[in-house]
Amino acid sequence: MKKLLAMMLTVILALTALMGCGGSNDSTTKATEKDQSSASQGTQGTEEATQSNPGEYTLPLTEEKQELTVWLAYSGSVVTDLNEIEGVKKMEELTNVHINWIPIEQQQISDKMGILLTSGSYPDIIDTNVLPGGIDKNIEDGVIRPDHDKLIKTYMPNYMKYLEENETARKQATADDGTLKIVRILVGEDYNVKAEGVYQGVAYRKDLLESLGLEEPKTIEGWHDALVKAKESGIENPFMINTTGGSFLSLAWGVTTMSQTYLQMGENGKVLGAALQDGFGQYLETMRKWYAEGLIDPNFTSFNFYLDTPNSVENNKQLLYTHILSAFTGNNYATYHMVNNQDEFLQPIVAPAADGGETYMDYSPLEGKDQMFITTSCKNPELAAKWLDFFFTKEGELLNWYGIEGTTYTMDADGIPQFTDMVLNDPNHTPPATILEKYALGWGNCWIGKHNTVASEKVATAAAGGMNQQAAAVEIWTSGVKNIGLPSGYTLTEEESDKVSTKQTAVQTLIEEYMVNYIIGNDDTSFEDFKTKLVQFGYQEIIDTYQAAIDRFNNR
């Protein structure tokens, strides 16, 4: 089990090289500024480090060598000193800014961030996907400088250009009051901003379905018949649902059952309670019927999709899975030596529409995630802003993700960077990502500046022998015609969070207990009575609160 867990963690970390980590919502409170002592070393006055025309972006950023201290998540294992990375050396040469790095293992971010915030002395720049209290609380507490809006608009023209070109990214980077309070890590391909896709969903064992002489079903009824045939062939419990009774298959009825909020978007920007929709009841009725027929594994409430799926795949225990990560689709369980079953092939699917109409997906596009910010300890905030902006330049993006031109990448005839054979075809079979850790900062599972998904996909494809099943899965799961996912980047105020947090916990518990007990036949409460109880527990108030937050987001 320990070996399996270690392998699972390794693969999931590899997955983050493609998908990254999302940030959390931030509460809105009054901002004040507090003086803090400097944590930077070797910095000089503001005027000496900035150009006479701040609207222009030129290199080097400063005539005289300057230093900044940067705290960030970094989980690479090849280098111990980030200044030994070849791309980082080149960045220093171009910017004339030396960085005193404070790298933190991703698993330690929460603990280390808590300690840092209470210390009262901060590095010049912090890059993190964990921020206790949210942005406004840390402005009020004197951690984050309150003048980011001016700094960004004056000294970060390359970042601003991306925001001006992408409306969603601009909204996700902007607070409800219309200001830019921090710098967002932007997601995209080479030189553009574009959201990532859906990285988890329904998948079936293609090899087992073919052994039954069946083609992929295109309807819910077809899947029912396939599960029946699988059971008759010896697969005792062919469908595995989530521990809560939910499933991405519920999208067939146009509802989400795999959400902590159990909220979704309807027509014209309206927030809906998923558990109040007719489709929710139809999903539960179908699952109750399938469970009674022995098609759903009775141990679903204790099944761990991370740890238990390999054993299920190894021993052909299931035909259909409600929840698979893109990293484990195709025959990747075998590729990663997590199973010995070389025939296994997990084929992703979009849940077929139960009414025969258009398909659904639960997708929250994220172009601007996590946060980078300049702290109140920074004595040279203008230089810090310019240095952050370098990562949004063409040179910065190439150095951060492709490394050194002529060594780890070349430019093709269309001006597109392509990794060299040194990276993709190492004679010692060293993984491309491992090679790149010596040359490009981004390959230490480090998100700073812009997260280039194309570079990640190229490496993942090479590592998979030229066939990127993971990317193919993402494309399939993001192909639903209608999207019911809430937008990314909306924020609840501190007052709103306090008002609904307890209600949300109670509603979530009520929904999940009802789903499980109704499916297994232990609860005969009608769906209408269940909905009435949800409203009594404050479900509508939660819906209204999120509606207000999303309305503010849409009006940014």
Annotate each predicted stretch with a short phrase.
Residues 222, 289-291, 309-332, 338-342, ...:
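Glycine-rich, aromatic-lined ligand/substrate-binding cores of catalytic
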Residues 21-216, 220-222, 253, 262-263, ...:
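Conserved N-terminal structural module of periplasmic/extracytoplasmic solute-binding proteins
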Residues 64-68, 95-100, 119-124, 141-145, ...:
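Loop/turn elements at helix/coil->beta-strand transitions in domains of secreted/extracellular proteins
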Residues 144-172, 227-230, 234-264, 268, ...:
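Carboxylate/His-rich catalytic cores and anion/metal-binding grooves
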Residues 16-20:
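C-terminal motif of bacterial Sec signal peptides marking the signal peptidase cleavage site
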Residues 395-517, 522:
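Conserved small-residue motifs centered on glycine
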Residues 177-179, 184-248, 265-314, 321, ...:
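Helix-loop-helix "hinge/cap" segment bordering the ligand-binding cleft or interdomain interface
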Residues 1-4:
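Positively charged n-region of N-terminal signal peptides that target proteins for export
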